[in-house]
């Protein structure tokens, strides 16, 4: 029995922002987002196994839609769609057939909305036309932004998130050969928007969160030519912020290394790139002049963070091996939870949960989890606080530089068990009359090399 068909109409809008389709033999569903629409996204149909789509930059609009269709059973179905904008062409997404139709916007008009008929497949599609968006409707962020070319391979389908006010979170998914999936959470005009590209795997996605008073200044992109691929693919991404905070490397080392960075030292406010099949081929970025928000204090070195709880905080030097990528959670109001993961050689992973305005604030993951679940040290916050950290470190065969082998935490009430094994060297991180309110250090791909702390005077 054929599925019931339903007519739908998204109406006319200021501009199309994003189109996403899912498909198998034919298109199963279509989803669209529009500028200035409070009901985003508009979804029609049932999900298919494959997904593709396009995100338009703020100064980009659709001028043409080309469709391919076929007859399945007693009904026609759209098998593929392609989109042409004032900048480039996207698609076809789906499976091309011999039957083709095209819709072209009249002069000085754009395609600003979709309508059609759907069942469990997309049966037909039509459009609404509207005058071209005025230049003033494009984001002021975009007009000031510098677009840095995408680095990596030349293949894949282009996507462009455009420029925003801030980048708040980055999600990275990995597969056997490289980076398969990226998702970015932006802030624009005090509203949150997210864009995703590629395909998640069973491994899920790792997260890099940017503090409210911080911003990304550069991205290290590594790429390589992988067997079975026609072009280079992205194998690893590392993000750096204005506070000297580094993400762990998301992925594996590649033969080519690039840096996405603004020559004028601007803040990263958007991404663009190319994705092909199940791998990310290239990544580029938009940079805008940095405002006061997220800029390091003139009296504070760039390597130290300044979250809300930073008043009166002091940064104690990290101890351990002098290799790996720096990371810094910055000072907070207190520490609520500690998570320690161990590997064959030493401490492989740390994560700290802090307090801000009596709410839990998770820090970023540092290092890499192993099959052994992380151990947890819970504090009876706010009555309990950490006063010192004992760390052991050693040079282990096969590792680059010394690594942390053990951590032990002392509070105003008790001492934790040792997390790890004794090392050749031991050091105590402590400042008399102070409590620990944050952590920093250095980490490799799957090991912790250094740990340091932020401290604040204990209030009476």
UniProtKB/Swiss-Prot annotation:
Regions annotated as coiled coil: none
Q: List residues of the Jacalin-type lectin domain.
A: 1-131, 145-289, 313-457
Keywords, comma-separated and alphabetical: Acetylation, Lectin, Repeat
| Compositionally biased residues, Polar residues | 292-309
**Pfam families recorded for this chain?**
Jacalin (PF01419)
Q: Which family does the UniProt entry place this protein in?
A: Belongs to the jacalin lectin family.
InterPro entries under this entry?
Answer: Jacalin-like_lectin_dom (IPR001229), Jacalin-like_lectin_dom_plant (IPR033734), Jacalin-like_lectin_dom_sf (IPR036404)
Q: Which residues carry this modification: N-acetylalanine?
A: 2
Please name the gene that encodes this protein.
Answer: JAL36
Spans annotated as Disordered: 34-57, 133-162, 291-334
PANTHER family, from UniProt?
A: JACALIN-RELATED LECTIN 11-RELATED, JACALIN-RELATED LECTIN 3
- Which organism is this protein's natural source? Arabidopsis thaliana (Mouse-ear cress)
- SUPFAM superfamilies according to UniProt: Mannose-binding lectins
Stated name of the protein: Jacalin-related lectin 36
Q: Which domain of life is it from?
A: Eukaryota
Q: Where is the composition biased (Low complexity)?
A: 133-143
Q: Name one GO molecular function term.
A: carbohydrate binding
């Amino acid at each position: 029995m054929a599925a019931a068909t339903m007519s739908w109409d998204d109406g006319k809008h200021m501009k199309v922002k994003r189109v996403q389709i899912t498909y198998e033999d034919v298109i199963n569903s279509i989803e669209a987002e529009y500028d200035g629409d409070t009901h985003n996204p508009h979804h029609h149909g049932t999900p298919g196994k494959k997904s593709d789509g396009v995100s338009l930059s703020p100064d980009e609009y659709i001028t043409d839609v080309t469709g391919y269709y076929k007859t399945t059973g007693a009904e026609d179905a759209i098998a593929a769609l392609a989109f042409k904008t004032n900048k480039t062409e996207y698609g076809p997404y789906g499976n091309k057939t011999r039957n083709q139709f095209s819709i072209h916007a009249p002069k000085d008009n754009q395609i600003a909305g979709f309508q059609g008929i759907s069942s469990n497949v997309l049966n037909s599609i039509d459009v609404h036309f509207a005058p071209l968006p005025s230049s003033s409707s494009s984001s002021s962020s975009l007009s000031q932004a510098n677009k840095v070319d995408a680095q990596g391979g030349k293949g894949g389908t282009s996507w462009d998130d455009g420029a925003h006010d801030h980048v708040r979170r980055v999600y990275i998914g990995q597969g056997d050969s490289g980076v398969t999936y990226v998702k970015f959470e932006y802030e624009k005009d005090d509203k949150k928007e997210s864009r995703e590209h590629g395909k998640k795997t069973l491994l899920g996605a790792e997260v890099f969160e940017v503090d409210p008073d911080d911003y990304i200044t550069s991205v290290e992109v590594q790429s390589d030519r992988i067997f079975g691929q026609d072009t280079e693919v992205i194998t690893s991404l590392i993000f750096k912020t204005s506070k000297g905070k580094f993400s762990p490397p998301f992925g594996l080392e590649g033969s080519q290394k690039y840096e996405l960075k603004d020559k004028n030292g601007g803040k990263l406010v958007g991404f663009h790139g190319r994705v092909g099949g199940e791998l990310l081929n290239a990544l580029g970025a938009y940079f805008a002049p940095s405002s006061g928000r997220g800029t390091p204090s003139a009296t504070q070195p760039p390597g130290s963070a300044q979250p809300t709880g930073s008043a009166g905080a002091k940064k104690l030097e990290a101890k351990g091996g002098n290799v790996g990528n720096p990371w810094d959670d910055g000072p907070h109001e207190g520490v609520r939870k500690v998570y320690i993961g161990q590997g064959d050689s030493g401490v492989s992973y740390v994560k700290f949960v802090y307090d801000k305005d009596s709410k839990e604030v998770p820090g970023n993951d540092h290092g890499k989890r192993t099959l052994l679940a992380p151990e947890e040290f819970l504090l009876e916050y706010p009555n309990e606080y950490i006063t010192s950290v004992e760390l052991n470190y050693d040079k282990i065969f096969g590792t680059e530089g010394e690594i942390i082998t053990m951590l032990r935490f002392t509070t105003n009430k008790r001492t934790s068990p040792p997390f790890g094994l004794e090392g050749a060297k031991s050091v105590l991180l402590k400042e008399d009359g102070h409590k620990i309110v944050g952590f920093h250090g250095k980490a490799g791909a799957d090991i912790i090399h250094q740990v340091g702390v932020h401290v604040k005077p204990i209030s009476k």
